[in-house]
Amino acid sequence: MMGRQSRQMAMIFVDIESLIPETHLLRKIERMVSFDFIYDLLAPYYPATGRPSVDPVSMFKMLLIGYLYGIKSERRLVEEVQLNIAYRWFCGFELDDTIPNHSTFSKTRTRKWQQSDLFQKAFYEIVKQCIDSGLIDGEAMAADGSYIPANVSRESWINVETEVEQSMQSYLDSLDEELSNQPGFKKPPTKIVRKCRTTSQTDPDSGYINHGSKRGIGYLMEATVDCKHGILTGVDVYSANEKESVLILRHLERQINLGIPMSRLALDRGYETGAVHRGLELLGITGYIPAIQFSNPPEKYGFSYDPQLDAFICPEGVPLTYHRLNCSKSTGKYLRCYQVEGDACMRCPKRPSCFDKAGIRRRVLASSCYPAFFRGHQRVGTPEYLAMMRLRKIWAEGSFSVLKREHCISRIRKRGILAATEECLLAAMALNLKRMVNAIFRYLQIYCSAGTTMGFSSFFAFVNRSLIVPYLLSYWRYGDDKRRVETPCKAAGVGAPNIELPQQRPVSDGTRGAGKKKSTQQPITVGNENCWLRLKQSRARVCQPPGLQNFQYRNGCHATLRNVAPHCILGTPVWIFTTGAIRNS
């Protein structure tokens, strides 16, 4: 007979959390990341009396959902949270709770959140949690900038003429101090110049994009990414008419001051200046930057540079030593002047072709930081350089591609430098959360069986405390049966007894292929703690403190652990073993 759906109203009790799949992204984020720090950041901006406000953590999570799932409109975001159970659960709303109005976001953002610098602090708090989990080590970093169009029309473009003070280009305070101590340094005289800048009437903070084939009004987003798992460690937003090479050193210095490790960094050709090379050295970073082929280098005329002497060697073997700094009056930039000492050039047979008749010695002008410039060029073409360039293309350029395609910053929707920075930080935070939880779950090989073994809440509290997380990935062959059982285990103490596995029988599913063995999940014992064992082949890969030297199964088989090797998972030392052949006792 034909069935009909009953429309009668029924009252039921529902646990919202039970409706969210174990593998859902928001469930992973909720278990791995704590947002309680937001209460401490915003406490000074909420009065102690009065009617309670909307929970700021719930509102912050709503904004994150918008950038995680590409929901650009805040009106639509409120509708999606109203309808989507997973979104409600993640934000802490029950089914009968009222969702905040879309206007609440704009009022709260301008009145409280922008004053507290919440988004910048929240971004670095997430990065700090990634560092504590071992997902960021700074061994391979990449930085790049990307131009993002602003939300303005072509008719709003205007040319604004401003008066600015022309001064020495400042890259880094320590670099400026080092330059001022060199011979020949003279601070250029203060000079007021008039500059014309293209911007928009509707968004005066934006600037003109003139980069390759890109044209328009927008912003420059500068970002640094750790190539281990693609976690973005720093995001800054500037007007589009700023130069990347001038901004990069202070961008990196801010991250180092916040405790972000950074040892090797890959950059593109746009950062190829002597000041950037020297600034990276002062920051303790090894830089990998493609070399620009200049049209008129000293090497073209047979000169070579000797880094030990800090001198150029002419074709006749005479050194041109460093003499002093020369300042260009038109640009305010400094150049290192190398010249021949004495009258060696006057007796040289190549003098007529080397320089004009009025001169008495040959000079070579180079970058004010040429020694660091040369050291950076020495790394070009090495295996490390090629590897870093590949990582830069994957993680730096790839991250910008993902941010623009999936996380709402293909175009800046709000207006003003503060609002543009907020958008870029939220998008970067959303990408970091995705990569963070996926990396941790990939490390620990977590499946739903973990919840039945030791409980998700206790397990993730265990992980977040950065304790030892021994994880057994063992492979064992039981006759012709290949079983796979997998989940993390609790810490087994040093000197734990043998692992005892309950003997299992093949199970038939009664359908096609009957007689084949099904994968089953059975708990085993390590010391006094329950864990799970992954069984697949006759080789074992075990992560566990030392002291456990062999397996003993209930059927009487033994396997000796060999090839002990230390590894690091989530910043925690673990030991990986491989077993020899399984034998009967």
What are these regions (language model features)?
Residues 2-5, 70-83, 93-500:
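Anion-binding and metal-coordination hotspots
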Residues 576-584:
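Short, intrinsically disordered C-terminal tails of secreted or membrane-associated proteins
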Residues 451, 455, 479, 493-495, ...:
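Residue-identity detector for glycine
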Residues 22-64:
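Basic, short loop/linker segments at the boundary and entry of helix-turn-helix/winged-helix-like folds
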Residues 463, 510, 520, 529, ...:
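Short hydrophobic alpha-helical segments enriched in small aliphatic residues
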Residues 483, 501-505, 522-523, 533, ...:
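Cationic, low-complexity basic patches in intrinsically disordered or flexible, solvent-exposed regions
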